[in-house]
Amino acid sequence: MANVVVIGAQWGDEGKGKITDLLSKSADVVVRSQGGVNAGHTVVVQGQTFKLHLIPSGILYPDTECIIGSGTVIDPKVLLEEIDQLHRLNVSTENLFISQTAHVTMPYHRLIDGASEEMRGDRKIGTTGRGIGPTYADKSERTGVRVLDLMDLDNSQDKFVWAIKYKNVILEKLYDLPPLDPQEVIEEYRAYADALRPHVVDSSLKVFEGVNAKKNILFEGAQGTLLDIDHGTYPYVTSSNPIAGGACVGAGIGPTIIDRVIGVAKAYTTRVGEGPFPTELDDEIGELLGHVGAEFGTTTGRRRRCGWFDAVIGRYAARINGLDCLAITKLDVLDSLDEIKVCVAYEIDGEACEHFPSNANLFARCQPIYKTMPGWKQPTSDCRSLDELPKEALAYLKFLAELMDVPIAIVSLGAGREQTIIVEDPIHGPKRALLDRNGEPIG
């Protein structure tokens, strides 16, 4: 039995959805612990593409319980659209459960999110405009609406009316936007409540019952380490904690429950929105990575910025999360390159630096120090074992493992489930990896 956390080791979009989908086959329960519809993950099964935002990837396995935890923020309209999409694809949501204490995104959250981002001008942080930040802000301000309020609208209607009137003042006076009609909003959300009611539970208790029953539990992270509100590239971050520690808080369990942490990283680096990005490529190679890697956001459709693998932020993610092993994704995107660069350190104002600087202004001045490696110039998407990989690709993986001091357990070579090299099931198998801590193949 093992309880496993899957987190993003970069700026999100690392391929966590595919890795979680692979591991969900061996999991009894999959828990989404933070974030909202600002996150997006794509899973491809037998040529069919599933794009999910709030619902855990484990929903594609009919016997797997999927829990949306209390650390998330829920837009009921989008969630119901997602449920409807799954039903049209003949996927059951009978095993989907929603935390009664998760906070609810309201129409005014989306309006304020968009208006405040516009007001920032050239100081934009790259929000998705989905109302996530304002929802978390109300949670911290203790004026938020929770799912349990939504389920008890007859008794909590005064709370809804007060919140809408309060936000109307902000919409009108600060952003010059028309006010919302409280009764219209309440009736809209009453319909959402009726549709979601069968799924609402005490999520912390449900997870705890799974732990006591010795079930395999998979905690699915959203976004990535460098987007963490406390440990990321602030202020260009999300409003929650996508790191491994955040899984405990968002799921309502203690840290001793967690057995291992898997970090997911692309074989290169991407970032969406604003903020410093030392290895960003504005040339034809950056364009190639974006084109071959189909680097467009699942949630926003925005083009992702692309660059070389950054081992400095990789080491930082390993430290912050206590990574046990890595899943490296999209190795196949590098197949056509003559040479591949890896950022091994930074230069800041003429001084070498091997550690991630928390100061955003300092980080913006970082110049990458690269190690150049030969490319392999042959396709890898059909490889199913380490022995089938070109020696240059294996050397590249070995180098990444050495730089991060974390073994590589999974190598993904495409979007499909079958396009994966894996030796041991990270949930049921022993704590070993495809590459050991010295980067040597296990065989």
Swiss-Prot record:
GO CC annotation, single: cytoplasm
Domain of life from the UniProt record: Bacteria
GO biological process: 'de novo' AMP biosynthetic process; IMP metabolic process
Disulfide bonds: none
MF term (GO), any: magnesium ion binding
Gene behind this protein: purA
Family from the record: Belongs to the adenylosuccinate synthetase family.
Keyword entries, A-Z: Cytoplasm, GTP-binding, Ligase, Magnesium, Metal-binding, Nucleotide-binding, Purine biosynthesis
Reaction(s) the record says it catalyses: IMP + L-aspartate + GTP = N(6)-(1,2-dicarboxyethyl)-AMP + GDP + phosphate + 2 H(+)
Protein name in UniProt: Adenylosuccinate synthetase
Main location, first listed in the record: cytoplasm
Enzyme Commission numbers on file: 6.3.4.4
Principal EC category: ligase
Organism (species): Picosynechococcus sp. (strain ATCC 27264 / PCC 7002 / PR-6)
InterPro entries from the UniProt entry: Adenylosuccin_syn_GTP-bd (IPR018220), Adenylosuccin_syn_Lys_AS (IPR033128), Adenylosuccinate_synth_dom1 (IPR042109), Adenylosuccinate_synth_dom2 (IPR042110), Adenylosuccinate_synth_dom3 (IPR042111), Adenylosuccinate_synthetase (IPR001114), P-loop_NTPase (IPR027417)
Cofactor: Mg(2+)
